[in-house]
Amino acid sequence: MTQDPHKMFDEWMDEAKKAETDDPTAMALATASKQAFPCVRMMLLKGHTKDGFVFFTNLGSRKGHELLENPVATLLFHWKKLRRQVRIEGAATLISDEEADAYFATRARKSQLGAWASEQSRPLPARDVFEKRIADIEARYEGKDVPRPPYWTGFRVSPIRMEFWNDREFRLHERELFTLNDGRWQSEFLYP
């Protein structure tokens, strides 16, 4: 039995990248408001190390507000073809500006422009308003590199719990839970 859930995650992700044709890095991100109302949405994992799991967003979005007010999150990866899922719980912290800048520079130009144009999660009166904003920003940065907006950054979820779930016949699933205690991972199996 492995005692390193990060290594196990990497192994499962490698298998998912071979088996899943559509976004094996897709994950559900659950946050909660200060009033404890949960909200979940799909995101893409953009990095994983022993320090945590990184994704990027607009701080003005609902998830941005919730993570700043209540900096905890749960991630869920579901790989249907492999009949597996991984659930990760932990503290969410902002990444460094340098890390956010480096990732932003790798994004497609249209995605960079969209980050400037979108007032994410705010009401949009009509689609053409958004398209005009994109065109205006595209004109502003014509022939120039697009810098990262100050409100666009990443979060790192540093896990304290990681559960690995394997589907089994007759709903006799296999669940292994890793819990971080005093800097060491402990594992146990759970009833399905």
Curated annotation (Swiss-Prot):
Subunit structure: Homodimer.
Job description of the protein: Catalyzes the oxidation of either pyridoxine 5'-phosphate (PNP) or pyridoxamine 5'-phosphate (PMP) into pyridoxal 5'-phosphate (PLP).
Pathway entry: Cofactor metabolism; pyridoxal 5'-phosphate salvage; pyridoxal 5'-phosphate from pyridoxamine 5'-phosphate: step 1/1; Cofactor metabolism; pyridoxal 5'-phosphate salvage; pyridoxal 5'-phosphate from pyridoxine 5'-phosphate: step 1/1
Named cofactor requirement(s): FMN
GO molecular function: FMN binding; pyridoxamine phosphate oxidase activity
Domain of life from the UniProt record: Bacteria
Enzyme class, spelled out: oxidoreductase
Residues where substrate binds: K46, Y103, R107, S111, R171, L172, H173
Sequence intervals crossing the membrane: none
Residues that bind FMN: 41-46, 56-57, 62-63, 85, 120-121, 165, 175
The protein, known as: Pyridoxine/pyridoxamine 5'-phosphate oxidase
Catalyzed reactions per annotation: pyridoxamine 5'-phosphate + O2 + H2O = pyridoxal 5'-phosphate + H2O2 + NH4(+); pyridoxine 5'-phosphate + O2 = pyridoxal 5'-phosphate + H2O2
One example of a Gene Ontology biological process annotation: pyridoxine biosynthetic process
